[in-house]
Amino acid sequence: QPDFMRGLLLLHSFEFDAARESFRAAQARDPGFVMAYWGEALSHNMPLWGEQDLEAARAVLQRLGPTREARMTRAATERERGYLASVEALYGDGTKVERDARFNRALDELARQFPEDLDARSFHALSWLGLSGSTRDTANYMRAAAEAEAVYEIDPRHPGALHYLVHAYDDPVHAPLGLRAARRYGKVAPAAAHAQHMPSHIFFALGMWDDAIEANIASLATARSQGQGGYHALEWLAYACLQQGMREDAAKLVQSVADDVARNPTPGNRTTLAYARAMWLVETGSADAMGRADVDETGIKSIYAFSAYDFARGVVAARSGDVAAAEARARRLQARSDTARGDAVGVVAS
């Protein structure tokens, strides 16, 4: 049905919230449609960032049936049972590492049983990426690439294959292999802001700054047309502008985030501003007003953005000979490391 298919396409492009809404709409049309529950449950898993809302996903499955056995009996076909078994593995007992491994094995079995199912094979590729959590394991990433390449050969417009190829090749060594997928992906999924942004990961690695600027302008426009901030694309756009010597354009972008924070100081907006100011400081080496003001981090759990900002302020202070200020930032970094070790994840892959 259309709602389910829309949710599936959005899921392949990591538009998790929008995908969830579509899967719920599919359930409303047909409360017994097992795959709509599968999709909603899977939307709570963000493998490239090592994040997962286990409680919410299990609640979705509970709406389908009170036990695994009860849920499996509602699957109408062998293929549906395979899909459902995959999320049962992902959200079952055990540690996240154990559940991710079982999810990978379940999708491997499904893809082997139904090799014509390009979505199953694409999700299998994604599950290889998810085995690495927030780190990059080259062997697993190349396994993901091999599976996604096989899907690409059959359907070069498959959004999952294109997206996961970009992620699999997202490093300076493998980036040339990802250029083909990067060129296609944004055109295949024009309504997904993430799909517009992701090709710039490859463009960044290859120093293709004009292409990176174009991709992130498109991503930002798509996000804003849907009522989203599009801040991740904005940060990358500002960085790409600086690489092209477009300092004034980059400054306007960073200032626009500060203006948004002044109007609406949400945790997300403030985190973005910390990232943006850190980037400005490192790239320009200038401790001007653009980068100098601290950002309120009240109520923000993630340490990464503010650690990056402390680091940038410390580097600029050290370069200018202000040893005391540099040491103060170093102490702040150490304190963050001591109190929130392991929280800084999910940046490179996003």
Model-predicted segments: where are they?
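Hydrophobic, small-residue-rich alpha-helical packing segments that form membrane-like cores
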Residues: 125, 138-191, 195, 202-205, ...
